[in-house]
Amino acid sequence: MYLKTLELHNFRNYADLVVEFGSGINVLLGENAQGKTNLLESIYFLALTRSHRTNSDRDLISWKTKAARVSGSVQKEHTVTPLEINLSSKGKNAKVNHLEQSRLSQYVGQLNVILFAPEDLSIVKGSPAVRRKFIDMEFGQMSSKYLYNSAQYRSVLKQRNQYIKQLQFNPKGDQVYLDVLSDQLAAHGAEIIFQRIQFLKKLEKWSQEVHKEISQGKEKLSFQYVSPISSNQADTTEKIYAALQALFQKQREKELQQGKTLVGPHLDDVRFMVNDKNVSTFGSQGQQRTTALSVKLAEIDLMKEETGEYPVLLLDDVLSELDDSRQTHLLTAIQNKVQTFITTTSLSGVAQQLINEPHVFNIDHGVLMQSKEE
Amino acid sequence: MQYPEPIAKLIDSFMKLPGIGYKTATRLAFFTLDMEKDDVTEFAKALISAQRDLSFCSICGNITEDDPCDICQDPSRDQKAVLVVEDSKDVMSMEQMKEYHGLYHVLHGVLSPMDGKGPEDINIAALLTRLQKNEAIKEVIIATNATPEGEATAMYISRLVKPSGIKVTRLAHGLSVGSDIEYADQMTLYKAVEGRTEM
């Protein structure tokens, strides 16, 4: 799918904008503070009815105006679907094909986008909690069973931690109930770990291809699921369940000492390895960036596999962070495959040569001009 | 300007009820002023009587006027089965079904350490002594809600009861009767497929 046209009315610094995009790479060129990211934000908003930058929809409406509108048309394989979101201080409504949707959840999914912003580097560099959040978000979108199990897991975990704290004050308390909570936690935990490993394998496969291309085959990316449960125990949920139960038994005394649950998927991690070395500790800045980018780009193929359509890719200020050869390979990887929006302050020589028929838009104070390249 | 004391007190009292805020309480209080005198007296009496005349059955824990309650005293009921529920409202729901003729046991809550409810804080000990004393009971049906806490409570009870050889059963999960598959949420469907039965 690709975004054919976009219309903005009083959105951020755009008073009125009508623009037609190309199905390939669209470059948004402009100096700082001209509205490049605002334009990406409007596309993200059109897809998901919320912004990636703010939780307050009021911020999206231009100063001194009361209502904003974002609309556009999405070209899918055979059909063109008009989308529209109206936003005012009273709330928002979303229309598909000019028909108002009673629930926003019915609207979402008409246009799929994947955004890559400089903050996404934290998937590689950040703490394990960031990575867990990332995989929970990604896999939750693909499987409602995963979403259900993680919600149940969180709630049982809270109860169990609380009960362990109570046992600290009352060592003669009921151990059978702790067993029950452990088994319940192990049951949901086993489902989560099993699905995480399955999904990670899929994501790894696609990431490897992208990574190979960007790094010109010099580096090999692999994922490792980090958990006290060894991988030979992890091929069925029953085995993981048994392994988790054994771990809870083994850790019981330590858990009672520390007053919390010490094993489980809420403490697991994903390690990104380049040439068998951990990128987050041993990788260079560039390697970390490439890894994060590969993982994000792999989502494109994964989404194609799951939904049957390629999403639209939004790259916010990514080119400036990559060296020339990585830029070249990034652009070849996405060329002719997905519609891409790239924001940048300058179009470097390499990128300019490489992109076939790029649509370059100059942005100046919220006004868009398509520059005609020779 | 402030409301006169009697009505201010009434508003304050209404606000102690769950789900009632200041505005609703004010509306209710002014409505009470216009009510028939007899109705108001009835209302006040009912409030007091509900607390004064009701107690918990010493056998099953259900709310009752007489101890033991009507159900526990009824010899025509099936003495072999005990259905365990979270609260007295659930007993009423089961009774309205008119198809269950056994006994009940009311837990008054579920195990939830987050809310300060441990095994000693709900009516489980009474259930165990009841099972020990009364050898006629052959089956314990656990009818706690399908929440994580309800499940944990069910598992806990079954662990304690099973060694005695009494059969422990759990209510089925799945589609609600008369509903369309189209409108069921995905997890309900998943549970329904998982718990399918042979025909």
UniProtKB/Swiss-Prot annotation, chain B:
One of its GO terms (biological process) is DNA repair. It comes from the Bacteria. The keyword Ribonucleoprotein does not apply. Keywords: DNA damage, DNA recombination, DNA repair, Metal-binding, Zinc, Zinc-finger. PROSITE patterns: RECR, TOPRIM. GO terms for molecular function: DNA binding; zinc ion binding. The keyword Zinc applies. Pfam families: RecR_C, RecR_HhH, RecR_ZnF, Toprim_4. SMART domains: TOPRIM. Belongs to the RecR family. This is Recombination protein RecR.
